[in-house]
């Protein structure tokens, strides 16, 4: 499994308001869902604008291991997927939650044994919810966390299962994505506190329906907290992948914290991506946010204001929002995100520790963070092998001299070349002749 370098990266301070146009690669969440659906489809399909990152490459490698043909065409971001008989093999999940939670249902359909493992940090991530659910649907599985083994029998009965998905919406999405291939489909009932990151389940449902799969949800008159996928074919669909809006948030934040202006092209008019919520968040913090055709532009205020916000549905934006809050002019309260303690790291503890180590004033609450602005100083910002922790440190570094980020390379999980994109954004800003006033 992969060993990462723990070298330090000097986060550049913005010497001028950040003014740039930043084109982002495709969405990880959409790419990996599209790969699963294409692998189970009734014919070949093409994905255009697919993200190529560690997480998506792990998914591609895993599907190839299981017998799916995946080739590049006209560049790495165009993928041709040819379904085939599923077979056994060894799957490396790395740190990719979408691989370790979306692939086991596929493996249960394979005609052989599939062994799963991942990075050391991944072995603490909760997986028993989806593995126990699969057992209840007829799968033969050894283990409750990485490493574990799925003994595929070539088919899976399916049926009804009750789970507690309050720890991650991926438990629901993972079961739904493959369910049309189960003999009885699947009915997933959630019994627990509110499911986090509901937009990701909406994304899964939308993509299933685009593939001709019949899905019943609470929003369409189905049973409360219950999702039903009927058995049947998955239609092959050629897809154009949207830019990754969650990755875009760090670049838009750069405009917000430097009184600058950043434009992201091809921002979708309608989307299920949680990253779209950054528009309302930045507006609430005093930024100007506007659309011009397919472009989204953020213009930063003279001073960001604090925010009191429930991030339960968009928890992956928490590191970006915490970095913004640490540079605002008043206190912020980030709520509804207790589930982040089970992500790549305990993101709440990590954010509190790293901001406080720079002189900040952050307190963990039962379900979030209270952030009171303070004069920050330079120091080492640990990434915890967490891509969003690394980009949060880069945002803080725009305003604070001497920030050194440990293992910036972890951003390759969802955004390879982040450092170059960041440097290009800042070099474009240097040519504007504007001076920083923060």
From Swiss-Prot:
Which processes are annotated in GO (biological process)?
amino acid biosynthetic process; aromatic amino acid family biosynthetic process; chorismate biosynthetic process
Q: Where in the cell is it found?
A: Cytoplasm
Belongs to which family?
Belongs to the EPSP synthase family.
Query: What is the organism field in this record?
Result: Rhodococcus opacus (strain B4)
Per the record, the pathway is: Metabolic intermediate biosynthesis; chorismate biosynthesis; chorismate from D-erythrose 4-phosphate and phosphoenolpyruvate: step 6/7
Superkingdom per UniProt? Bacteria
So what EC number does this one have?
2.5.1.19
Q: Where is the signal peptide?
A: none
Question: What residues form the catalytic site here?
Answer: 316
Q: Which residues bind 3-phosphoshikimate?
A: 28-29, 33, 168-170, 316, 343
- Disulfide pattern: none
Q: Name the chemical reaction catalysed here.
A: 3-phosphoshikimate + phosphoenolpyruvate = 5-O-(1-carboxyvinyl)-3-phosphoshikimate + phosphate
Q: Name one GO molecular function term.
A: 3-phosphoshikimate 1-carboxyvinyltransferase activity
Q: How does it assemble?
A: Monomer.
Which InterPro entries does the record associate with it? Enolpyruvate_Tfrase_dom (IPR001986), Enolpyruvate_Tfrase_sf (IPR036968), EPSP_synthase (IPR006264), EPSP_synthase_CS (IPR023193), RNA3'P_cycl/enolpyr_Trfase_a/b (IPR013792)
Q: What is this protein called?
A: 3-phosphoshikimate 1-carboxyvinyltransferase
Question: What are the binding positions for phosphoenolpyruvate in this chain?
Answer: 28, 97, 125, 170, 347, 388, 413
Pfam families according to UniProt: EPSP_synthase
NCBIfam families documented for this protein = aroA
**Main localization, broad class:** cytoplasm
Q: Which UniProt keywords apply?
A: Amino-acid biosynthesis, Aromatic amino acid biosynthesis, Cytoplasm, Transferase
What is its biological role?
Catalyzes the transfer of the enolpyruvyl moiety of phosphoenolpyruvate (PEP) to the 5-hydroxyl of shikimate-3-phosphate (S3P) to produce enolpyruvyl shikimate-3-phosphate and inorganic phosphate.
- GO CC annotation, single: cytoplasm
């Amino acid at each position: 499994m992969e060993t990462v370098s723990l070298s330090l990266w000097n986060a550049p301070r913005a010497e001028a308001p950040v003014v740039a146009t930043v084109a982002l690669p495709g969405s990880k969440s959409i790419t990996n869902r599209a790969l699963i659906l294409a692998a189970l489809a009734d014919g070949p399909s093409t994905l255009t604008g697919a993200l190529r990152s560690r997480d998506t490459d792990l998914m591609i490698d895993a599907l190839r291991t299981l017998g799916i043909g995946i080739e590049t065409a006209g560049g790495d971001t165009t993928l041709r997927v040819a379904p085939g008989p599923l077979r056994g093999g060894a799957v490396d999940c790395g740190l990719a939650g979408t691989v370790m939670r979306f692939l086991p249902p596929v493996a249960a359909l394979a005609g052989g044994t599939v062994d799963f493992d991942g990075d050391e940090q991944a072995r603490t991530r909760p997986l028993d919810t989806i593995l126990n659910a699969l057992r209840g649907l007829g799968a033969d599985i050894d283990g409750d966390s990485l490493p574990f083994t799925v003994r595929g029998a070539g088919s899976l009965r399916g049926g009804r299962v009750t789970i507690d998905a309050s720890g991650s919406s991926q438990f629901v999405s993972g079961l739904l994505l493959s369910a049309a291939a189960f003999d009885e489909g699947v009915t997933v009932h959630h019994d627990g506190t509110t499911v986090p990151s509901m937009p990701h389940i909406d994304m899964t449902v939308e993509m299933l329906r685009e593939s001709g799969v019949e899905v019943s949800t609470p929003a369409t008159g189905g049973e409360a907290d219950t999702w039903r996928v009927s058995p049947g074919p998955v239609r092959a669909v050629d897809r154009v992948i949207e830019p990754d809006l969650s990755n875009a948030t760090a670049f838009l934040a750069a405009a917000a914290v430097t009184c600058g202006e950043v434009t992201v092209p091809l921002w979708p008019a309608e989307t299920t991506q949680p990253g779209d919520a950054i528009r309302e968040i930045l507006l609430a913090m005093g930024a100007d946010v506007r659309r011009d055709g397919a472009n989204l532009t953020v213009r930063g205020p003279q001073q960001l204001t604090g925010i009191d916000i429930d991030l339960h549905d968009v928890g992956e934006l928490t590191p970006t929002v915490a970095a913004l809050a640490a540079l605002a002019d008043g206190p912020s309260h980030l709520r509804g995100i207790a589930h982040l303690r089970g992500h790549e790291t305990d993101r709440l503890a990590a954010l509190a520790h790293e901001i406080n180590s720079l002189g900040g004033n952050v307190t963990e609450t039962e379900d979030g963070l209270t952030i009171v602005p303070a004069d920050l100083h330079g120091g080492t910002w640990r990434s915890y092998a967490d891509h969003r922790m690394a980009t949060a440190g880069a945002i803080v570094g725009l305003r604070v001299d001497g920030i050194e980020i440990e293992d910036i390379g972890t951003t390759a999980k969802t955004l390879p070349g982040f450092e170059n994109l960041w440097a290009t954004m800042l070099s474009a800003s240097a040519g504007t002749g504007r001076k920083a006033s923060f």
